[in-house]
């Protein structure tokens, strides 16, 4: 794995509300196919922490979701929150990454990071299925250096029966004529997330969530996640 810390136009602005620029880390690590990809991580360090919290975001967010968690943990606890590939400030790969690929990607990343020891997994939204898939594979590896000591899931799905339909909002968003307009051509899907928030999302926080998604090319994976 190679750190890529050189300045880039595609890094979180230093003045985002609640964001510490020192948390940003760029690394080159493989994806599911072994292709080197550029990942952006929220990483509080240190590498020898007594516990690591692996935090996995959902859609349409990025590691900014975990800013309060990163600020609250004691100094001997490390938070690692990757921007999933094609999301946040991580590389746009041009590959439609379905759930199985995202699980493989996360496994490849944690292997490259040489994650070991006491690990608590925290996940939100689509990060839940990705994190649970990662957990299942990690538990199945008899020689894994990782000891899972906790799991926190928020606003996610653990299991959906085959006959169950998606929530109304998601079903509507998936309509072929609406999906690209709401998720790629515009920021409507992102802004809809804010409108569902109670209390209302402050403008400074909205700016934080919107920061990586300023153009249609950077929003394509939002549609693919839906």
Model-derived features: positions:
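Conserved catalytic-core motifs of eukaryotic protein kinase domains, centered on the activation segment
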Residues: 65-67, 90-96, 162-165
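Conserved hydrolase catalytic core segment
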Residues: 117-165
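Conserved alpha/beta-hydrolase catalytic His-Asp/Glu region
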Residues: 161-164, 183-226
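A catalytic-pocket lid/entrance helix-loop region that shapes and gates access to the active site
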Residues: 157, 162-183
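Active-site loop/oxyanion-hole signature of alpha/beta-hydrolase fold enzymes
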Residues: 20-23, 27-37, 42, 81-123, ...
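An N-terminal hydrophobic leader/cap segment in hydrolases
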Residues: 1-26
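Alpha/beta-hydrolase-fold catalytic nucleophile elbow
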Residues: 83, 154-155, 212
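Conserved HGGG/HGGXW glycine-rich cap/lid loop of the alpha/beta-hydrolase fold
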Residues: 42-89
């Amino acid at each position: 794995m190679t750190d890529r810390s050189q300045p880039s136009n595609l890094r979180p602005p230093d003045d985002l509300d609640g964001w510490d620029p020192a948390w940003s880390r760029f690394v080159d690590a493989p994806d599911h196919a072994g292709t080197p990809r550029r990942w952006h991580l929220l990483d509080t360090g240190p590498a020898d922490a007594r516990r690591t919290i692996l935090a996995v975001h959902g859609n349409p967010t990025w590691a900014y979701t975990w800013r309060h968690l990163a600020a609250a943990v004691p100094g001997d606890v490390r938070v690692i929150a990757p921007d999933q590939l094609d999301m946040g400030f991580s590389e746009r790969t041009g590959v439609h990454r379905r759930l199985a690929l995202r699980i493989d990607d996360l496994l490849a990343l944690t292997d490259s990071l040489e994650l070991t020891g006491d690990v608590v997994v925290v996940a939100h939204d689509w990060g839940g299925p990705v994190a649970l898939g990662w957990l299942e594979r990690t538990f199945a590896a008899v020689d894994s250096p990782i000891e899972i000591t906790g799991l926190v899931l928020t606003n996610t799905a653990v299991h959906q029966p085959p006959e169950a339909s998606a929530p109304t909002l998601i079903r509507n968003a998936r309509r072929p004529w609406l999906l690209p307009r709401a998720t790629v051509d515009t920021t409507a899907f992102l802004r809809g997330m804010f409108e569902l928030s109670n209390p209302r999302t402050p403008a400074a926080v909205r700016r934080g969530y919107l920061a990586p998604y300023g153009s249609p090319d950077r929003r394509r994976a939002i549609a693919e996640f839906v």
